[in-house]
């Protein structure tokens, strides 16, 4: 090979070898200069998606209850139980204002027969409609949502040693209002939401159930209203990293269980109202504008007649 050709060959090889490095450098530069990224906190819902845009965010959650709050709000230690849940929200923008979605779930828990088993959880279908889209730096948005819970999980016949408690048994309707705005030149995003479960939900019960009934019971549970309120803030410290602070207040106005036990005696029990206040710190890592990971924990810090949950969780958010 001539010296001239050898020189050209070496030059070509050097250029080819440097091209990936150059591309990576450009990508790194682009990443460093990129805008702040957000994928949403653990609990506060998102506003409607643009038309033709979809989102899926599978969660893996492990929940323990090392204590409970009594009727006076005192924290009392208890034997911790652990349950694993997979929760998969899926949303799609039909128009710029209307987003439809569904949430699938499954539980993996200990069973009476020993070991663990999995079961399908309740399913939710939803519709979200944008009420206001603001201009300017804050880009404030307001939306209203309607969610219907379908009782696809297990809530009774729990005396079966192979059966996992994974649902409520009740078809319920929830109405929600939620808002979002940006601050600090787009580096801080705030969300707030409140949701009300409408009255009238009820579940038929046979045997042992999530409502505290025993084997042989036949009757029903009627659920009162419930409310969940969240506030959150996401702060972008780097194009790839976002810190999340969130608080959640949940209130259940009790339920009533009526029926007959295994001896044929009448049962009429009113469960008291309960509430819980939780903190949900989290951190986000963004692989790109459309893919990110969030990891955090729900910590029940105060309440009445409810468990002091500790629920570490991780999710992958994918836009498409």
Protein language model regions, located:
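Outer-membrane beta-barrel biogenesis signature
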Residues: 25-67, 135-139, 143
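Detector for outer-membrane/organellar transmembrane beta-barrel domains
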Residues: 51-63, 163-263
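Repeated loop/turn-to-beta-strand initiation elements of outer-membrane beta-barrel proteins
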Residues: 97-102, 134-137, 186-190, 240-243, ...
């Amino acid at each position: 090979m001539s010296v001239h050709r050898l020189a050209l060959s070496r030059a070509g090889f050097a250029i080819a070898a440097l091209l990936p490095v150059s591309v990576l450098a450009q990508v790194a530069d682009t990443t460093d200069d990129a805008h702040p990224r957000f994928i949403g906190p653990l609990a506060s819902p998102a506003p409607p998606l643009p038309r033709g845009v979809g989102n899926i965010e599978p969660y893996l959650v492990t929940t323990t209850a090392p204590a409970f709050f009594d009727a006076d709000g005192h924290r009392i230690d208890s034997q911790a139980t652990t349950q694993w849940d997979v929760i998969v929200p899926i949303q799609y923008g039909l128009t710029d204002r209307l987003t439809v979605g569904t949430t699938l779930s499954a539980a993996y828990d200990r069973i009476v027969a020993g070991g663990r088993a999995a079961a399908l959880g309740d399913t939710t279908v939803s519709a979200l409609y944008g009420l206001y889209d603001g201009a300017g730096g804050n880009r404030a948005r307001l939306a209203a949502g309607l969610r219907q819970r379908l009782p696809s999980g297990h809530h009774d016949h729990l005396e079966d040693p192979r059966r996992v408690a994974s649902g409520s048994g009740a078809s319920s309707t929830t109405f929600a209002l939620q808002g979002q705005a940006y601050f600090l030149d787009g580096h801080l995003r705030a969300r707030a939401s409140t949701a009300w479960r409408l009255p009238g939900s009820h579940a038929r019960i046979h045997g042992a159930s999530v409502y505290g009934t025993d084997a042989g019971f036949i009757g029903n549970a009627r659920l009162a209203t419930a409310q969940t309120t969240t506030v959150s803030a996401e702060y972008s410290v780097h194009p790839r990293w976002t810190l999340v602070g969130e608080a959640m207040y949940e209130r259940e106005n009790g339920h009533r269980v009526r029926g007959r036990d295994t001896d044929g005696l009448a049962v009429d029990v009113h469960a008291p109202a309960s509430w819980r206040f939780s903190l949900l710190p989290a951190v986000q890592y963004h692989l790109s504008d459309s893919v990110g990971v969030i990891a955090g924990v729900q910590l029940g810090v105060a309440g009445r007649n409810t468990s002091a949950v500790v629920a570490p969780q991780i999710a992958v958010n994918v836009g498409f």
